[in-house]
Amino acid sequence: MPRGLELLIAQTILQGFDAQYGRFLEVTSGAQQRFEQADWHAVQQAMKSRIHLYDHHVGLVVEQLRCITDGKSTDADFLLRVKEHYTRLLPDYPRFEIAESFFNSVYCRLFDHRSLTPERLFIFSSQPERRFRTIPRPLAKDFFPDHGWETLLMRMLSDLPLRLPWQNKSRDIRYIIAHLTETLGEDALPRCHVQVANELFYRNKAAWLVGKLTTPDGTLPFLLPIHRTDEGELFVDTCLTTTAEASIVFGFARSYFMVYAPLPAALVEWLREILPGKTTAELYMAIGCQKHAKTESYREYLCYLTESDEKFIEAPGIRGMVMLVFTLPGFDRVFKIIKDKFAPQKEMSAAHVRACYQLVKEHDRVGRMADTQEFENFVLDKRQIDPALMALLRQEVPEKITDLGEHIVIRHLYIERRMVPLNIWLEQVEGQQLRDAIEEYGNAIRQLAAANIFPGDMLFKNFGVTRHGRVVFYDYDEICYMTEVNFRDIPPARYPEDELASEPWYSVSPGDVFPEEFRHWLCADPRIGPLFEEMHADLFRADYWRALQTRIKEGHVEDVYAYRRRQRFSVRYGAISSTANSS
């Protein structure tokens, strides 16, 4: 290869990333217009399009590089020089951290995820000590109650870029002050002030004002979800001021925010104070930089390995029929491998399972489906694998592992947030905790269905409980769109003997689902059955599911709230006009 080509390749990769992030910002910048026009289907399409941008631009760069090198193979020294040139381009580059991840992606695409070493890739950042020397403009604006909180909030809401009229701004301000007074106390409120991000965070059918509430005792989140009525008038739906509430809003089971962030690292640092429980990976994920979040997630995993002497073990819970799941006892993630052979009742292919996981990545997860990161050629040190797990790997996934002596390479796996399996949780709790868990499970089913997702296998073992007590679905091999399912009532038995027969007396076609049958396995436990019948009996009726299908087919997009219904101002303080119920 001629000298000088290394720099050209490095520049080509960085220019490719520039193009990708430019398009990322372009799609993001349309969020305000989509919100103002209530174009909810465009919101969903933009979310999918933005996710696809990254891989699309990686592919474009790879094709460019193949043209530049004329398809000739490149030796290791040549690639090291390319990385050296690329590293020299980054010190003055505003998005250096994501540019490093983009370089990694291009390399992996070129070399089919082989030879993934720190020398060739940015496994760790080339500039870990660097922070933001200059920010072109402030990320946030401060508001002080010099003339009282009513004036402060009036200025804050009037300062928003939204061009729609308010339904009743004075009312919303009264509600916010009432909440803050209840939370902080009347004496403390005058000594507090707010810092608000310049950019709104858009997701689903809401525009979130995200801020920091500085009190005499510390800093709290200050989150206002702003909605629009069918008539195009704005209203504030609630005010959230605890770290737990903020953590749920920015949770791993939710779709990525659309927030205009030309300097994503600066925004991540700004968010860290009000989301202290979130890792760097989770913060990048929340603002839509999911590929760099994968890089950060892998770095967090490597750091954990260096600080721990734990061994990988099979994950607790009922063993899956499609996925082999393992973990580290103290790590908050699980590793999931698609088995070489599935249980006989699972009539599907590995390609189908991967397609289901991709569907979840692109779909609105409504706070009820865990996000995943996908890895290829994942290396594990044999010394860190428990012998029982090693035997299980050789038994269940021999075609997906390569033995390199001291290490094994797993051809493909997913990493996902670790949760307590719901079936285990239900065995351990009672009283109000049991009631809350059953309510959460039913709500998860309803919200998934309203978002056009049918879980397929709704057994408790396929759901997990987060640290905030939320129930989240994580077994995706049987999911499908609601509109693909035929919900049927079980026909009346022709004869008494029919109900005792081992085979049904009625025909069953692919895609047929009989909600009445859910009762047999959801209500078998006498502790659970009465609670389920009380709160979610309509889930056993086919007409409930068919009514949801009708709404979906008619184009309705349901509201998705990242907080309890009882927290809405309309429930707490008074009735917001019924026109606020969007269709």
Swiss-Prot record:
Binding site for ATP: 315-321, 336
Pfam families from the UniProt entry: AceK_kinase, AceK_regulatory
Keywords per UniProt: ATP-binding, Cytoplasm, Glyoxylate bypass, Hydrolase, Kinase, Nucleotide-binding, Protein phosphatase, Serine/threonine-protein kinase, Transferase, Tricarboxylic acid cycle
GO-annotated cellular components: cytoplasm
Entry superkingdom: Bacteria
Its biological purpose: Bifunctional enzyme which can phosphorylate or dephosphorylate isocitrate dehydrogenase (IDH) on a specific serine residue. This is a regulatory mechanism which enables bacteria to bypass the Krebs cycle via the glyoxylate shunt in response to the source of carbon. When bacteria are grown on glucose, IDH is fully active and unphosphorylated, but when grown on acetate or ethanol, the activity of IDH declines drastically concomitant with its phosphorylation.
EC number(s) reported in the record: 2.7.11.5, 3.1.3.-
Record's subcellular location: Cytoplasm
One GO BP annotation of this record: tricarboxylic acid cycle
Active site (record annotation): 371
Catalytic activity field: L-seryl-[isocitrate dehydrogenase] + ATP = O-phospho-L-seryl-[isocitrate dehydrogenase] + ADP + H(+)
Family of this protein: Belongs to the AceK family.
Protein name from the UniProt record: Isocitrate dehydrogenase kinase/phosphatase
Entry's Gene Ontology molecular function annotations: [isocitrate dehydrogenase (NADP+)] kinase activity; AMP binding; ATP binding; phosphoprotein phosphatase activity; protein serine/threonine kinase activity
PANTHER family: ISOCITRATE DEHYDROGENASE KINASE_PHOSPHATASE, PTHR39559
